[in-house]
């Protein structure tokens, strides 16, 4: 494997969904550093001065994904790399009984359907050019589901991972690599908000809720959560020409959380 070229993404058009904060921002910044033209999507605008092209959209809706597809095809004439990072959970604590039908639907709308809809709209141009990379950001919760706060999220990520594998089987022979990156606990603002919800629901302090989450995951042998920049570096490698034989698989970055090999 050759070393990373500082401008390895020069000339590449990259779309990062959920790219204004957390791991998504770190991923977008990494591609920008590598010389790519980067478009990011989110409901809220990024910090002023970002060099990425911002497309405001709610990807949990079909209208939002249709808008992004029009913008990408119209402004950039297609895309070379898609990183489906958007997703998350806003379900309350309390376990299974608290997850209503609307919350189950919301989990799918936020964690599965954006990827399906965007792939449907943007893959044809990739296939026409005979090349491209699609990275779906899943989660280790697809195999280590937690019942408190993220049950529906975990199920949606399991669906995303299986969808990604099926899609790779179809389009890899056409020159399109499709793979999944599944992080464990990432120390982001969104994770902080989720931990605070757990703390409020259990009437404990933040540090106790953070430790509870780590314990629920079975512990992190590395001793700490992932950093957004570490996830971004893995995604950049997976999308680069250093990984041209990697498709149809899941790459886990979790500090050793998953207890099996």
Task: Please provide the spans of the model-predicted regions.
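Conserved glycine-rich cofactor-binding loop
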Residues: 13, 20-21
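Short, small/polar-rich loop/turn modules that mediate ligand/substrate recognition or access, typified
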Residues: 172, 177, 246-248
């Amino acid at each position: 494997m050759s070393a990373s070229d500082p401008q390895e993404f020069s000339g590449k058009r990259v779309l990062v969904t959920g790219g204004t904060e957390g791991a998504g921002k770190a991923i977008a910044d990494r591609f920008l550093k590598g010389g790519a033209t980067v478009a990011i999507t989110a409901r809220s605008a990024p910090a002023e001065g970002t060099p990425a092209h911002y497309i405001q959209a709610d990807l949990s809706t079909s209208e939002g994904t249709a808008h992004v597809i029009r913008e990408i095809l119209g402004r950039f004439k297609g895309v070379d790399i898609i990183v489906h990072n958007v997703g998350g959970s806003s379900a309350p604590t309390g376990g299974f009984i608290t997850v209503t039908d609307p919350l189950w639907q919301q989990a799918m709308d936020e964690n599965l359907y954006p990827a399906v809809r965007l792939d449907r709209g943007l893959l044809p141009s990739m296939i026409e050019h005979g090349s491209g990379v699609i990275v779906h950001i899943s989660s280790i919760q697809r195999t280590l589901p937690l019942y408190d706060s993220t049950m529906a999220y975990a199920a949606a990520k399991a669906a995303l991972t299986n969808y990604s594998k099926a899609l790779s089987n179809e389009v890899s022979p056409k020159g399109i690599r499709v793979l999944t990156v599944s992080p464990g606990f990432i120390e982001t603002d969104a994770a902080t908000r989720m931990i605070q919800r757990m703390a409020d629901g259990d009437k404990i302090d933040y540090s106790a809720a953070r430790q509870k989450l780590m314990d629920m995951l079975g512990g992190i042998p590395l001793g700490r959560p992932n950093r957004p920049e570490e996830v971004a570096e893995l995604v950049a490698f997976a999308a680069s020409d250093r990984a041209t034989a990697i498709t149809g698989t899941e790459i886990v970055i979790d500090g050793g959380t998953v207890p099996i090999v």
